[in-house]
Amino acid sequence: YWNALKRRKGELSTICRQLKLTASDGKKYMTDVVDDEGVNTIIALIPSKKSLVFEKWLKGMGSSIDDKSKQKAYELFESGMINEIEVGTVKGLQQIHAYIFGGLYDFAGQIRTMNIAKGGFAFAPAMYLQDNLRQIENMPDDTLEQIVDKYVEMNVAHPFMEGNGRSTRIWLDLILKKHIKKFVDWSKIDKKAYLTAMQESPVDSSHIYELIKGALTNDINNREIFMKGIDYSYYYEQVDE
């Protein structure tokens, strides 16, 4: 179908030289991209018995919770609602979580009442969580060291059933922006290094501190850096195959 469209010189695609996918022969090939109109053209070329299946598959793409919540994270910035978020408070973190996961999780913005664990690490017990969150909220956040410590403690608390990392990284950036006039360019922090540092942080936060310090930028109103940061934040949460 791709070749047929190209022969007909339709407005089709560009080569995505940075994105290669594995084909059935086991080799990786550069991919083509089309817009909505191009997709409809492709469907029209497919034999009718198969076109409905293909169309249903296409409509299902981009519909995961991650994709939808990422779009909401973009909108949080684009709409200006991010400027209404309480900075450095539990309520502020709940506001972020409620916005980017609203309509996707029933518990969006709600503090969990159940115990959770990940990778063998148990986060703050639910029965003590409210007290822990009050203590974290009252932690000082005037310097980078203090802000990173507060971020680490909030990660250990993990106040939501799901979506903690994505929400808390935005929360961290707002604190940095308010108190030291910087925020993190997450594209400068390697995924493996970040995840390793966060695993170590309950015992030793020096590694995550150095990663964050090395990725700080003064360009706090740069839309591109923020949007790229959202992409990297969601990338950190993806399970590597």
What is the meaning of each model-derived region?
Residues 1-23:
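Major-groove DNA-recognition helix of helix-turn-helix-type DNA-binding domains
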Residues 23-35, 40-241:
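FIC/Doc superfamily catalytic core
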